[in-house]
Amino acid sequence: MILTQDKFQSIVDSFSKLSPILVVGDLGIDKYTFGEVRRISPEAPVPVLEVSKEWDKLGLAANVSDNLKSLDVASTLCGVIGEDSRANLVEHLLEERGLNTWGLIRDKSRMTTYKERVTTATQQICRVDYETKDQIDEETLRRIVGRIQDFSQTHSGVIIEDYGKGLFSETLCQRIISIFKEKNLIVAVDPSRSSPPSWYKGATLFKPNKVEAHIIIEAMGYFKERNLETIAKILVDKLQFEKVIITLGADGMAMLDTKGDGKLQIIPTAANEVFDVSGAGDTAIAAITSSLLAGASLEEAAWVGNCAAGVVVKKRGTALCSKAELIEYFQNLRQLIK
C-alpha cells in the first residue's frame, strides 16, 4: 500500500536531523566524455567522436555519500585511494560537494579507480576502466578498521558498498558488522556478485538486485531456485539478515522483514521513464538506509528508495536526487495511482 503524502514528507523531513551515516566502500571517479559522431575513422572502422563536453563525477561508494548529501543526510566516506593525481581529484570533488575526506586512506601500490564513459546523446560508445582489483594489504586493512572503529562512536549506521575492487574481505565485512551491531546500529549492505555471501552474514539490511540475488543463492548451493519469496527466506535464514530488499528493475522491489510478518511484499516500480540506470542502486541504498534510520518501516523505506531511484534513472550518467525532487516525484506518483 502506498504511503500517504504526510508520512512520506515526514520521513524525508527527518533526514536532516539524522546523525551521520558511515559509508565504507570501493571509491572512484566516473568521467563522462560527451559528443557527436559524424564520421568513421579512416584509420580503423570505428566512430570518431567530436567532443563537446567532459565532466568528472564521484563514483562507486563515493556516489552513495554524494546521494546522501543531496538528500540532506550527513555522512562520512571511508575507503582506499591511490597515491596519484586521480586520488587528488577524488578529494577535490568531495570537498567541492562539502563532503569530508577524513576517512580516505592512501595506498601507493594501488591505482585510484577511474571509469571513463564515451557517449553521444543516443548511445554509449565505450567505457575505459583504470583500476586495481588486488586485495588490500594487512597494513591498509588495519588502518581501515581503526578508522571505522573511531567513526562508529559518532555515526548512526553504516552502508557497506561492495563493488568488488579489492577493499572488502570476510575479515573486514565481519569486523564492520560486529562493531556496529554491538552498538545496535544499522548495517546496510549493497553486495558485489563476485564476493562470497558469507562475508555479509549478520547484516541488518541486505539489498541485492535480482541478478545478484540469483548469483548469491547459487553460490550457496541453490542452483534451481527462482521463486523470489524462497530466495528472500534463504537469505534471511542462512545469512541471518534482519531485512532483505531485492530490487527488480522495471518490476519494482521485493522485500522481506523478519521483524514484520515474515512474508514477501512487492511494490511496483516508481520509474515512468528510464534514460540511464547508472548509480540508481547507490541512490536507492542511500534513501532506504536514511529512511530506516528516520524510523520508517521497511515498506515505507522501500517506497522512498523506489522514488529516489525513479528520479535518477531519468537523468544521464551517475546522477543525484534532491529532497525537493523526491517529494515532487512522490506527489506525481500518487496522482498517477489515483
Predicted segments with their positions:
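Substrate-binding N-lobe of the ribokinase-like
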Residues: 2-9, 14, 20-21, 42, ...
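Conserved phosphate-binding/catalytic region of the ribokinase-like
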Residues: 3-11, 135, 154, 171-186, ...
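Active-site metal-binding loops of divalent metal-dependent hydrolases
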Residues: 27, 163, 283
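Extended acidic/charged loop-beta regions that coordinate divalent cations
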Residues: 31-34
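Short, surface-exposed connector motifs at secondary-structure boundaries
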Residues: 69-76, 153-159, 179, 239
